[in-house]
Curated annotation (Swiss-Prot):
Subunit structure: Heterotrimer of A, B and C subunits.
Role description: Allows the formation of correctly charged Gln-tRNA(Gln) through the transamidation of misacylated Glu-tRNA(Gln) in organisms which lack glutaminyl-tRNA synthetase. The reaction takes place in the presence of glutamine and ATP through an activated gamma-phospho-Glu-tRNA(Gln).
GO cellular component terms, semicolon-separated: glutamyl-tRNA(Gln) amidotransferase complex
PROSITE patterns: AMIDASES
Protein's gene: gatA
Family from the record: Belongs to the amidase family. GatA subfamily.
Keywords noted in UniProt: ATP-binding, Ligase, Nucleotide-binding, Protein biosynthesis
Positions of the catalytic residues: K55 (charge relay system), S130 (charge relay system), S154 (acyl-ester intermediate)
Enzyme Commission code(s) on record: 6.3.5.7
Reactions the enzyme catalyzes: L-glutamyl-tRNA(Gln) + L-glutamine + ATP + H2O = L-glutaminyl-tRNA(Gln) + L-glutamate + ADP + phosphate + H(+)
GO annotation (BP), single: translation
UniProt protein name: Glutamyl-tRNA(Gln) amidotransferase subunit A
Keyword hit for Protein biosynthesis: yes
Amino acid sequence: MITDRVSDYLEKIEKSDVNAFIDVNSEKVLKEAEELEKNDYLKNKPLYGKIVAVKSNINVKGYKISCASKTLEKYTGTYDATVVKKLRLQGALIVGMTNMDEFASGSSGETSYFGPTKNPAAMDRIPGGSSSGSAAAVAADLCDMAIGSDTGGSIRNPASHCGIVGFKPSYGVVSRQGLCDLAMSFDQIGPLTKNAEDALVLTNAIKGIDRSDSTSLETPKFEKKDISNYKVGVVKEFMDVTDEKIRNEIEKGIEVFKDMGCKIVDLSYKYIDLALPTYYLINYVEFFSATRKYDGRRYGEFIEEACGEEVLRRILIGKHISEQEFSGKYYKKALQARKAMKKEMLGLFNSADLIVGPTVPKLPHKLGEDLSPMEMYAYDVLTVPTNICGICSGVVRCGNIQGVPVGLQIQGAPLEDEKVLSAMIEFEKNY
């Protein structure tokens, strides 16, 4: 019975000390489960009875959509985001809203107004962010699967640290209507799951064109493909910036592709040093613009007076860069760099079907450890190129270092999501 499974998960959530959830409405989800059991039309849908957690920056009617900030602490969603509507139409149940870095501004899961999320795979370490609660909920078996958002690695980073699967679709594949934006030219909604097969199913469920999001695209259903004849690229610079212990685990993963019949191709990406400055300069400006709606009048509190340190830092830097006398010095140059980075990245896919390598260059730090902003941003150096270039990218578990999971990142050209998802599935089977 679906209601029994829901009750079991609710009990697990209640007993958990991971702090993966911000808002859970037991009465609401149990009532919806009872109604679902009577709904014969949905019984053959791919997500029938699946219990899904949703990141707290995606609107779900009747739940707190706080973005893990005091700014929106009292705001309740008045509608379902397009992805949530699609989940319901496929027979899924929403169990609650997950914890996250405040306004998705972070890579550790520590900046939430509601307290840090713990990593179920290594409880004394960060789970990664910003989709920290979604990843932790899946890793701790507090739900069947979860939805997160990825602006510069916010699905893939925590998936790697927590030892689960995460997928960032190509830009436009999934509607962002109902997402509280961080940087709209980077943002993408995607799945966090226990295995790659589920990532394929969940991506198919939420993707598709949406008249409410002009960037959204219609794509055919993603199917599993044979990857045995694929050329798999390994970028030297991605490996060079990665800690040796992680690199060793990734090299074992590359051997798996070789054993599957793939040809390994050595590649070079000369713009790796531009990745972080380009990403963050654009991110700051877009985030400053996005936060102007949190003025304390229509809903919530005035963001500059209520937000945490990292969010305020990004707002103030974004404001500074946005001022007319500075835009040519920073922002416009960042846009030029983005164009060059994208051209270079797309060129790599002329030589390879996929690019594989590390997800993050170092192991997650200990909870509460004091890192400078630049040390924190360094977690993103291997994930932000995906968002800068609008390509697709997934993460699957690839070993561990003293019990701390390591994730293998698989990248594909724009709208080649099917290739990446297929490679994730095949890697998982053969690893």
